[in-house]
Swiss-Prot record:
Species in which this protein is naturally found: Rattus norvegicus (Rat)
UniProt-listed PANTHER family: TRANSMEMBRANE PROTEIN 14, 15 (PTHR12668), TRANSMEMBRANE PROTEIN 14C-RELATED (PTHR12668:SF4)
Species lineage: Eukaryota, Metazoa, Chordata, Craniata, Vertebrata
Transmembrane segments: 8-28, 33-53, 63-83, 88-108
Protein name: Transmembrane protein 14C
Keyword Mitochondrion: yes
Function: Required for normal heme biosynthesis.
One cellular-component annotation, GO: mitochondrion
GO BP annotation list: erythrocyte differentiation; heme biosynthetic process; mitochondrial transport; regulation of heme biosynthetic process
Domain of life the protein comes from: Eukaryota
Keyword Transmembrane appears in the UniProt entry: yes
Membrane topology: Multi-pass membrane protein
Family: Belongs to the TMEM14 family.
Amino acid sequence: MQKDSGPLVPLHYYGFGYAALVATGGIIGYAKAGSVPSLAAGLFFGGLAGLGAYQLSQDPRNVWVFLATSGTLAGIMGMRFYNSGKFMPAGLIAGASLLMVAPGVAKIQEITTMP
C-alpha cells in the first residue's frame, strides 16, 4: 500500500505567496496614498504570515500562527470590504485570507482526528 504524501502543493508554498501579497499591498498603499498605517499593517501581517508559512514548512502540523494571521486579516478586511464596497484592497485581501483560512482549518481537523 502506498503512503499518502499529502497535497500536491503544500500549504506553505501558498503561504509564502500570500505573505508577499499582504506585504506588497502595504507597500503599494504607502506608495500611492502615503499611508503609514497601511505600510505598517502590511509589513506586520505579511511578516506574521511569512513566519507562519515558514513554521508550516518545518512542521506541517504547526498551523496556528498562519491560521491566526489569515483569520484576523479575513475578519478585518472583510469588514472593511463590507462597509466600503470597494474590492481594492479590502476585498482582495479578505478573499485571499479566506482562501488561506480554509486549508488551515482542514489541516487542524486532520491533526485532531489523527490517532
